[in-house]
């Protein structure tokens, strides 16, 4: 039993400067993985008025046209004319990637990783984590996708905002935008009321705020907000500054990895601090966070807990996690210690084991770079599958 509480989460559209950078970094990663699934990639992007900078380190046998990837990605997002303050065709693109020779990789790396899915247990054990760090995964049965309600709703709003812009329903909208929702939870920890909704959207200069308010309510709020969660006490804030014409990279600079809470659980669960986009699956910041979500989601889907948070930690060069911690916040059918042992038995959480378990050497990452990496029922992501849930039910 808990006290009533209000919890707030936010989302941003694909046209937000930080999210543009995430999408460019993951577009580069996907393009390299298409050519060479063994590519090692650490690709960071920065964006500002009229300029994109792509930097980092890659080890690959593939070759991709980075400039074209940048321009195509920016155009796809919707920055395709000068009056938006940023134009994919005319912006400057600086590439500062250190392209390392494929021969630099140690022979042992090549031998161990060449046939990832055929590796022996000894080979998996031999591949250590690429860095130290801790990663968290979370799941809750408060939504169909087993995500916290506030971030789930915030993403639905920004996705709908993008949809009505792209399909021409609201042609005066521009790509940048944000949502924020405040949800009231009752004593049982269930979401019961929508306390506040904030939505800011970039727009053409000649549209009135009255028109924007009317259209956002009709075309964004009505299709998305559950009627049973909204009443006369719900507060709505639409473009509360009164004007949002200057936006995107023309309004703010952006960087890869600046929206890690939007990418994950909206602040409802803890975060280890590592960003995802632009990193290949040998980086545990990304792969172990995906594995932690996979574990937590299967525990909740199996009925072993209503809520589950898992922490993994790694030491550089060591395969086995240095720690596994599970917290079910008093909702578990087994103790946290028992669940930890169950996880050790059923999930291979060594870096190479994660790559094999989730088949991560594929170009599947750009689609995750906006609107969240988790709870994406619209995408067939391996870490969102609940294929272990049936197996775990035997512990009920």
UniProtKB/Swiss-Prot annotation:
Claim: Magnesium is one of the keywords in the record = yes
PROSITE patterns in the cross-refs: ADOMET_SYNTHASE_1, ADOMET_SYNTHASE_2
Where is the major localization of this protein? cytoplasm
Q: Does the keyword Thylakoid apply?
A: no
Q: Where is the protein found, in the record's own terms?
A: Cytoplasm
EC numbers, comma separated: 2.5.1.6
Q: Which residues bind K(+)?
A: 44
Sequence positions that bind ATP: 16, 176-178, 243-244, 252, 258-259, 275, 279
What is a single Pfam family found in this protein's UniProt entry?
S-AdoMet_synt_N
Per the entry, the cofactor note is:
Binds 2 divalent ions per subunit. Binds 1 potassium ion per subunit.
> One MF term in GO for this entry?
ATP binding
UniProt similarity note:
Belongs to the AdoMet synthase family.
Role summary: Catalyzes the formation of S-adenosylmethionine (AdoMet) from methionine and ATP. The overall synthetic reaction is composed of two sequential steps, AdoMet formation and the subsequent tripolyphosphate hydrolysis which occurs prior to release of AdoMet from the enzyme.
This chain's protein is named S-adenosylmethionine synthase
This protein's species is: Lachnoclostridium phytofermentans (strain ATCC 700394 / DSM 18823 / ISDg)
